[in-house]
A protein has these predicted regions:
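Central antiparallel beta-sheet cores of small beta-barrel/beta-sandwich binding domains
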Residues: 13-139
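Bacterial Sec-dependent N-terminal signal peptides
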Residues: 1-15
Length: 139
């Protein structure tokens, strides 16, 4: 049986998520280019497994601010085949337009001596439930 031991602390996780103030790059619906960045990331003092985030998504020039949570999932982390730390995420975009909605999915952080790898993936659903697309972005 393999046991995962993380060397990343909560403070380091917040810093990692900020990504040196650079945006993450990815795609939505496997075709539209997307940039995602965080304005702030902080540990919830009442729930030490939860990070509160504020940020933005930019899909081909259409920008939307969001707020949300990233929550450490110990069960998924324990079962991770590549020893990644797994978090559940939910980001709610501000606005009520057809192209505003919720990102829900997972963040995996894989430790490396060179550069820690952060990968976000899941599904974006608009508030009217008329559009639903897979997304991913990473550092």
């Amino acid at each position: 049986m393999m046991t995962f031991v993380s060397t990343i602390t909560n403070a380091q996780t917040s810093k990692l998520l900020m990504n040196d103030a650079k945006s993450y790059i990815g795609k939505i619906d496997d075709k539209a280019k997307m940039n995602v960045g965080f304005y702030s990331v902080f540990l919830d003092k009442d729930s030490p497994e939860t990070y509160k985030v504020n940020g933005y998504s930019d899909v081909e020039g259409t920008k939307a601010d969001f707020s949300g949570t990233i929550i450490f999932n110990s069960e998924k982390t324990k079962n991770s085949k590549d020893e990644s730390k797994i978090y559940d995420l939910k980001f709610s975009e501000k606005g009520t337009g057809k192209h505003n909605g919720i990102f829900s999915g997972e963040l995996s952080i894989r430790e490396s001596s060179d550069k820690n790898q952060l990968k976000f993936e899941g599904t974006w659903t608009n508030y009217g439930n008329t559009m639903k697309f897979p997304f991913y972005f990473n550092n």
